[in-house]
Amino acid sequence: MRPTDETYFETLETGLDDAFEVAEAARERGEDPTPNVEIPVAKDMADRVENILGIDGVAERVRDLDGEMSREEAALELVADFVDGRVGDYDTDAGKIEGAVRTAVALLTEGVVAAPIEGIDRVEVNDNDDGTQYVAVYYAGPIRSAGGTAQALSVLVADYARAMLGIDAFKPRDDEIERYAEEVDLYDSETGLQYSPKDAETTFITEHCPVMLDGEATGNEEVDGFRDLERIDTNSPRGGMCLVLAEGIALKAPKIQRYTRNLDEVAWPWLQDLIDGTIGADDADEDTPDAGSDSDATDEGDAPSASTDAEEPPRAAPSDKFLRDLIAGRPVFGHPSKNGGFRLRYGRARNHGNATAGVHPATMHLLDDFLATGTQIKTERPGKAAGIVPVDSIEGPTVKLANGDVRHINDPADALDVRNGVAEILDVGEYLVNYGEFVENNHELAPASYAPEWWIQDLDAAGADVQALRDSPYVDLTAPTADQAMAWATDYDAPLHPAYTYLWHDIDVEQFRALADAVADAHTDASDDDDRGVLVLDHTTTVRETLEALLVTHHQGDDTIRVDDWLPLARSLGVTESLDREWETLSEAAAEWPNAVRAVNEVAPFSVQERAPTRIGNRMGRPEKSESRDLSPAVHTLFPIGDAGGSQRDVADAARYAPDMSDTPGEIPVRVGDRVCPSCDEHTYESRCPDCGDWTDPHYECRDCGAVATPDESGRVECPNCGRDLDNVTTQVIDINDEYHGALRAVGERENAFDQLKGVKGLLSAEKTPEPMAKGVLRAKHDVTAFKDGTVRYDMTDLPVTAVTPAELDVTAGQFRELGYNQDIHGDPLEHDDQLVELRVQDVVLSDGAADHMLKTADFVDDLLTQYYGLDAFYDLDDRDDLVGELVFGMAPHTSAAVVGRVAGFTSASVGYAHPYFHAAKRRNCFHPETNVWFRDESGEWHHDPIETLVEARLDPDTADEDDFGALVQALDGDVFVPSVTEDGEETLQRVEAVSKHPAPDHLLAVETKRGRELTVTPDHSMRRWTGDGIERVDARELTAGDALPAPTQVPGDGETATSELRSESLDGTHPQRRFGDGGSVRTDEVVSVEPVRSSVDHTYSLTVAETNTLVANGLFTGQCDGDEDCVMLLMDGLINFSKSYLPDKRGGRMDAPLVMSSRIDPAEIDDEAHNIDIDREYPREFYEATRELADPEDVADLITLAESTVGTDEEYTGFGHTHATSNIHLGPSLSAYKTLGSMMDKMDAQLELARKLRSVAETDVAERVIEYHFLPDLIGNLRAFSRQETRCLDCGEKYRRMPLSGDCRECGGRVNLTVHEGSVNKYMDTAMRVATEYDCREYTKQRLEIMDRRLESVFEDDTNKQSGISDFM
C-alpha cells in the first residue's frame, strides 16, 4: 500500500475512534438496550475473523501471517499461538483446540459465513480404552457452508493442536468403525453428499484419523446395526460428522496432503492410499466419482445471434426485450438497432463504470428532460439496464428545427435555446459504454463507431507524426478543418476523419446515386464564411431525406437546400470541387451491397469507415432517486402503542386513549419483553431499572412450570423442566401518557416542538425491546424518522466516479487539501478549484437532498447528546460546508455490513457519487414466470397458478416502487397467503406482504429433483436446504446433486382439492419420502442436477412473505426474492442509536443492518463486478478492429487493463484512468421530467409527443405497447380487485370480507367503506381509447378496449333506473 493510502485510512480510523469514544460514553449514560456501541469495527478480513469469533488477538496475528503464507498455512501456524496461550484465553486443552479449529474455519471462509460459529458445536477431550486421552470435535450441519477444504483442514488443525498438547490419538473400537460406515451411508441416502465414499473408505478414515469426528444427531432416521454405542450419543446420523468425513477428508485428501508433508508433529501417511484409490479396490463401484475433482458449470454467455454473413456488414442482432412491459409515462428513446438511435461508442469517462451509460447532456435536454443524471434506462445491450451519466466529450444529437435548419447540438446551452423549436430529432447522439460492461455481461463486442480516438491511431499507423500534430497550435485532431481532414486522408492513405464521415451505412445505393446526381447538378453561392461558398441543391424529397439520414448539417428552404462546408460530402460522392462527377457506374459488388459504404469507398479519393454501425435501442426505466428511507408508515420512535394511536400511530392520541369512561387514559396493553434487574429484582420492560438504574436482563420464565432459564451459548433458551423453548415476551399494561410526558421532560421539550410524534403498533424483535421514547421526540422535532434498527437513513441512486474537481462538488481546493488531497491526476500541486483529482476510495458525494437530511440528522444527534445523554454536542454544524470531512456509513445490501465513508462534496443531481469500490453490487434472485405457486387469494380461494399470474394481477406500475435495477415492488393491502415453512421444518401459513417483478438475467439455473420436480430460478436465488438439523438458506448456485430440498405434503387450511393436487405433485406414490421436523408434515426431495440454462424470458417474479420468507414453488419449499437499497447514515447516529435488539425476529430481519463495520475497503474482498472496470487512458487500435469482427470480450482481454489487474498491488487504490473527459458531472437536467410532470396523463402525453419527434421511434408501436402492457392489464387487474375487495373501517382500520349490514364497524362503530373505488378502476379507460384513436392503433387493440369499456359499464352503470322511451320497445 502506498504511504498516501495508509495516511488516508489512518485519518478515517482516527475520526472513527473519536466518534466511538463519544458514542461509548453516551451509551453508558442512556437507556439503550446495552451500554456499549453494538457495531464492531473490522478493518479487514482479519478483523472480521476476530469479530465473528470474539477471540482477542486473532486479527493482529492473522495480519502478521497474511503476507508470509497462504491462509491454509496461516491457519496451521495459528495453532501454536493457541496452544502456547499467545492468542485466546483458555484454561483447558479442549478450549485451546476449539479456539484453533474455529479460527481456522473462520480464516478459510474470510469471516463471512456462519460455519465457524454454528458448524462447530464444541471440542472435548475424552478417554481411550487404554487410559490415554483423545480429542473429539463435534460438528453440526452448518459446517457445510465452509466447503470441503475448510472442513478437512479443521480436522488437521485439531490433530496438530492435539499433537502439540501431547494428547494421544483417537483409538476407535471395532463397532464404532462399522457404525461410521453405516452412518455415512444412511446420511447419504437420506440427505445426500457431494461425494459418497465407499464403506471401505469410511472405515479406513475412521480407523486412521487421529481425531474423533463427532456431532449432533440430525433427522429422525436411525441406524439399524450399530446402535446404543457407549461413546456415540445418538443412534441417528451425525450430519456434520458425515460432511467432514466425506466431503472434507475423503474428497479433499490431495489438498490435505500438501500441508501434512510440512508438519513435523503430524503425519498422515494413510492419505496416500485414499489418493491412490486403492482402498476397497476389490469391491469398488465403477460409478464412484473422482475424489479429487471439483467441477463447475460453464457459463457460455448469451450473446445474441449476429450477422456475420460475407455478403452483409457484421452487425449485432437487434433485440426488443427492453421494450416489453412498456408503461405509460416512460418514453422510448430508440427502437431496436434503428437508425437515429443511440450510436455505440467505446470508452470510459471519470463518472462512468458499473452498469452506467454516458450520453451527451444536450441529448438529455432535447429528450424533453426525461433523462437526468442517474435515470435508469432499459437497454438493448450490453446489459439490460444502465444508469445515465453526462459526458460532454462525445457527440450530441442532430435535430431538424422548425425553420428548416439541420444542426448538430454539442452544447447544453444550445440545446436549451433550440428545444422549443425542434421539429424532429434525427439522431440522439452517442452512447458511451466501457469495455468492462461487455466483460461483466459476457456479451460479444458490437461494432464500434469510428471515433476520433480510433482515427488518430489509424493516422499514426499510416505514418503521420501524430505527436507533432498534437503539439501544433494550428491543429485540432478531434475537430480539424475540412481541408486538413481531406489532406491527411489523401497524403497518408488514411481514412477520412470521423467529423466528415457521414452515415453512409444508413442509406442505400439508390439514394447514394440520387444524391451524387443532385450534388453534380448543384451550384454554389458566395459566402462570407467559406471561400468555396455554399452548396445549393434542388429541394426534393429524396435529397432531403438522404441528407437527413447522413446527418449532414444544412438549411432547407422551400425550393433549395443549402449546405456549408460541403467539399468532404462532394468528394465522398465522387464529385470534384468544380462539381464534376468522376464516375459513371458502380461495380456489381458496390451496387449490390446493402448500404452505400462500398459505393463511397469506390468513388471517393480516400477510404471511408463505417461511422456508426451499432445503434442501441433503449427506453426509460425508473427515475433517479434521492430520498429518506422510512418505515411504512414512517415513525419517529420504536415504542409500541398498539391500536391506540389510530391509523396515524399518534403517540399523543394514544396517551389520551381510553376504551371506556372507566378506564385510565393512556393505559394500553402491549407486547413487550419482560426484564429483571439483577440488583433489586424489579421486573420491567425497560433496559434500565426504573428503581435503581442498573442495567436489566431478559427474564425467561416457563409459563407451564414457572422455571426460570437462561440462554445457552447459542442464544437458545429452553425450560430445564419441560424442554420447551422460551421467550421473555409478555403482555404488559403501559401508561403511554406517563411515558410520553416523561420523554418530553427527559429532553426538555414541549409538545409544540413538533407536529406529531409517531410510534409503532407493535415490536417485531425477539425480545421486543422498546426504544426510549425521548429519542423519538427529538427525531420528530428535527423532522427525521427511524428505520427498523433505530437509525436515520437516506437512500440515493448510486453512481460511480473516479476523479472530480473541487468546484463541481461545491467545495474549494483548500477544503480538499484539508481532506488530504495534495495533487491532481497529473501530479501537479492542488491549487485551483478546477483541477482534477482522483477520488479516494471511501469518499462520497452527497446529493443536495442528502446533505440537507444529514444536517437535520446532525442537529438531532447533537440534541440527543446534550439533552438526553448530558454530553457535549458532537457536530455543531451551521451549514452544509461543515459536513465536508464528516464520516458516514454506507450500507452495502445483503452483507449486513456498513462501510465507513467520508463526505467530500455535494451534487445537484439526485444521486450519490462514490468510487466504484464503495458501491456494493445488488443481488436480485427470483423465479421463472411459469413457476407454479400455491396461494390463497383475498376472497379465501386457493389457487395453483404461475407466479406471473399472481404478481401481474396485483402489480400497479403507477404505484409500485422501482429500485436501481428496474425491479418493480408492490406492497399488498389485501390478504394473500401462501404455504410456508419455518427453519425447524414446521409448515405454516404466511401473508404475502409484497409482489415484485424483475428484469431477467441472461442465465437461469434449472434445478431437477429425484421425484421429477423442476424449478428454474436465478443463480443467486435463495433456496432452502435440509441440513439434518434444520433448514438452511443457500444460493441456488451452491446446490449440488444429493442435496435435500424440503417439500410439503398439504396446503395448510381448507380445500380438499388443493391438498389433493399438492399431494399428487409432491409424491410419486411408490417411494415414501423422509419426514423431518417435530410434528411437521414437510418431506424432502433429492437434487439430481443443477444446470445453467439461457434465459428465454424478459422478467422473473417473486413474493415477499412475512416471517419465514418461504413459499411453495413447483412443489418445493424455497425462499423469496432478496433486495435492499443502498443508503447512507450519519456515523454518530449509527453508533449511538443502532441496536440489534430492535431488529425483526424473522428471516432477513438482520439484513441491511450494520452488524459489523468495515473501516477499510479491501479491493480483493469486494464483488467482482467492481473489478470489471477498465482503467486505461485509451483503447488500442486492435480493440476497435476486433469489435468489427464481433469478437468475444475475452479475446481482447490482453489489450485493455481492468481494475482487477491491480488488486493486491500498491496501485490497487489508484490509477483509475479514463478515456473520455466530462467537464462537469452535474451537467444535464437535475431532475427527470418524469418526476416534475404532474399526473400520469401528463407524463404519457409527453412520452408520446417525444415519440413523434424521434426518428428512431415508431410512435404507433409505443402507443400500442402502452395500451397492451400498461392500460389493459391495469384495467383488468383493477376490475378483478374491485370484485374481490375487502371493506375497511375508516376509523380503526378493521377489515371485513363483506360489508356489515349496518354499514358500521363492529369494533368501534365507525364508518365502513370500500377499499377499491370506481375511479381507481376505470381511471385509464378514456385515455386508452383516445390514444388508440389518435395514434391509429390496430383494430384488435381498439376492440379489446371496447370490450373492456362494456365490462366496466356493466359493473358501474345502474340501468335499473334508466328512463326508457317508447322507441326502446319498438
Swiss-Prot record:
Keywords: Autocatalytic cleavage, DNA replication, DNA-binding, DNA-directed DNA polymerase, Exonuclease, Hydrolase, Multifunctional enzyme, Nuclease, Nucleotidyltransferase, Protein splicing, Transferase
Secretion signal span: none
Organism this protein belongs to: Halobacterium salinarum (strain ATCC 700922 / JCM 11081 / NRC-1)
Protein name per UniProt: DNA polymerase II large subunit
Description of how the protein assembles with itself and partners: Heterodimer of a large subunit and a small subunit.
Catalysed reaction equations from the record: DNA(n) + a 2'-deoxyribonucleoside 5'-triphosphate = DNA(n+1) + diphosphate; Exonucleolytic cleavage in the 3'- to 5'-direction to yield nucleoside 5'-phosphates
CDD domains membership: Hint
Region ranges (Disordered): 279-317, 1041-1081
Gene: polC
Function: Possesses two activities: a DNA synthesis (polymerase) and an exonucleolytic activity that degrades single-stranded DNA in the 3'- to 5'-direction. Has a template-primer preference which is characteristic of a replicative DNA polymerase.
Coiled coil: none
One record GO biological process: intein-mediated protein splicing
Protein family according to the UniProt entry: Belongs to the archaeal DNA polymerase II family.
Pfam family, one: PolC_DP2_cat
GO MF annotation list: DNA binding; DNA-directed DNA polymerase activity; single-stranded DNA 3'-5' DNA exonuclease activity
Xref: HAMAP family: DNApol_II_L_arch
Post-translational modification: This protein undergoes a protein self splicing that involves a post-translational excision of the intervening region (intein) followed by peptide ligation.
EC number: 2.7.7.7, 3.1.11.1
